[in-house]
Every structure is written in C-alpha cells, then in structure tokens.
Amino acid sequence: MMMLAVAAVLAWPAAAQPAVAEADFIVRDFGFGDGRRLPELKQHYRTLGTPQRDAQGNITNAVMIGHGTGGTGAQFLVPQFTRLFAPGAPLDLATHFIILPDAIGHGGSSKPSDGLRMAFPAYDYADMVRAQGLLLDHLKVKRLRLLMGTSMGCMMGFQFGTDLPGRAAAIMPLACNVIPLAGRNRLWRAMAINAIKADPDWNGGNYTTPPLNGLRVGVALQVMASSAPVRMQADWPTRDAADAAAQRAMAQGLAGSADANDRIYQLEASRNYHPAPHLARITVPVTWVNSADDVINPPGVGDAALQVKAMPQGRFVLIPESAETRGHSTHTWSQFWEGELKALLARSN
C-alpha cells in the first residue's frame, strides 16, 4: 500500500552501495481502456544490478518488482528488502538485473497532478500492466526471469500473468487476492475517496489548497488497513505510547500523501480487477504469499488456497501471525519469505 518515499539506503557498507540508475521511457500515443489517449505517457523506472544478454542482445536475467498503491519503486530500497540483493543472496546484483518501475499514476510516471487533474484518463491495472510490457520491450527484456510484486504490485502480478502469459519465467505475488475488490477492501478505499471529494477545498479536483481534512481521513484509514495488531500491541503497550504513535503516523502519512487527485485515481485503479477466471493462463511456477495478520487480505477472504489450484504450478503460502510479522507490510520484510523465493527460483530454473 501507500509507502513514504525513502532514500536508497541499502544493506551494504556505505562505500560499497550498489548504483541505482533512474530513467524515463516515453510511449507515444498510448491508448487507455477507457478509450482516452495520451500523446505521451512517461514511465519512470529504476534499475540495479548486472544485465546479461543473449546473442540477440536481449536481457535474460531481469527481475521486475511492482510497488503498492501510492508507492514507487523506491519503496524497495530499504534494508529489509535490499538484503535480497546482497552478494550470495537470492537476487544477488552480480547475477540479476533489477527493474523497479513507477506504475502509471505514481511517482515519476504520468499522473493526474502533471496537469490534467480529473481529466486524466481513468487508468486501471490492465493499462498499467500493458505499459510495463512496453517498458520491457524498450529495455529488450523478452521474458523476465522473475516477476515480483507487493500489494497493488501483487495484483498487477496476477494481471500481468493473465494478460501477458509467458513473459515471466516465474511469478511471486505478495499480499493480495485474485477476487474483485469488494467488502472491507473496497469500503476503506471508497471512504478515503469520498472524504477527499467531500472536503470543500477539493473543489471538483481544481483546488489551490490541498484538501487536508479529506486526506487526513484517508491516512487514518490507511494506517488501520495496514495495521498488525499483535506487533502493534508489543510496540505500543501503553495508552501514551499508542497516542504518540497515532500522532507520528498522521504526520508521516500526510507528509508522504500523494496529491489528492492522484490518490483518487490510485484507489480507483482496482475497480475492475478480477483475474480469478483467467488464472489457468498462468502456466509458469508461481509462489503466492499472504500473511495471517494482513487486515486487507485476511485468511477468511478470497480462498487463496483454493484459487491457487487453477495455476498448474501454483503454490500458496500463508505466513503465521507473530509479534514479528508486520501485517500487510510483511510483504516487504523478506526474512519471512526468503526461503520461498529461493525455492521458486530453483523450480523455475
């Protein structure tokens, strides 16, 4: 889900930090599923590691990792995730080429706040995945060695697998389901959208002052949706500690909030997500990981253990709740699922 922007603090000594390259790719005359077109669609992306190429110049060792709603590719540049890139680790940068795209509507990629505001095309996950396929074409990646994604990136992983079958040799979706977003998962999103639109400062999207009251509601809903009850009880065992944490969470959430129009679009992009009927198209090895303390994707919703059987080489893993797991955000704490990543790479080699 929404993550604060982070510096590229990697799990190496400062003098040995790997380089993170950033670039933009422009798609001309990009058509969206709603029938709208943009003369230019910008996709921002980051890369790390060492590309290996075949005789035709195609990159053969690429790993693409998709971020969550409101995030960017930079959200993975934190020690709990970049430990996977260290020497000898599963995604060692000496032998892997990592691609961290900013999805449409996020980060440095084209989004409503660039100028069109609420007249921006109503993009969805299918549009976002198709654009990322064009980015891979641009980078000369015919087939990914691995596609990973967390939260929204998890859902986009299933969308990618069904819309672009065979373009990834293995897929590891973390923290999502394959059913339409309804129930509580849609409820909190709808409430966040409605809170922004109900703020008089929003002014139909043509605001000069950010609609902070509406954004505050969204931050509060986000914090609760991403909560980990057992972990939080251990971290804030007293009323005063919890009150202080609430103040910090609101301040940090507002500081990291997207533009209000961008946020509306980000939350609406999931409106027609429903890959479940098409999962049989995904014939490559898949390891799908959820966590038992994920409030957004709890074990009783979505029937992941049954849905995974539609994929011939699918495996579903549910991480048990503990004082160490991080709720929905367990998807970025790689120590909980690194062994599953190693096994997936081994069975898709």
Regions found by a protein language model. Give the residues of each.
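N-terminal cap/lid subdomain of alpha/beta-hydrolase-fold enzymes
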Residues: 46-114, 303
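Catalytic active-site module of serine/aspartate enzymes centered on a nucleophile-bearing elbow/loop
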Residues: 313-349
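Conserved hydrolase catalytic core segment
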Residues: 143-182
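Short beta-strand/loop motif that positions the catalytic acidic residue
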Residues: 282, 288-290
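Alpha/beta-hydrolase-fold enzymes
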Residues: 167-252
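Conserved alpha/beta-hydrolase "acid-adjacent" motif
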Residues: 295-302
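Active-site nucleophile elbow and catalytic-triad environment of alpha/beta-hydrolase enzymes
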Residues: 262-278
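Cap/lid segment of the alpha/beta-hydrolase catalytic domain
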Residues: 89-138, 180, 184-202, 323-325
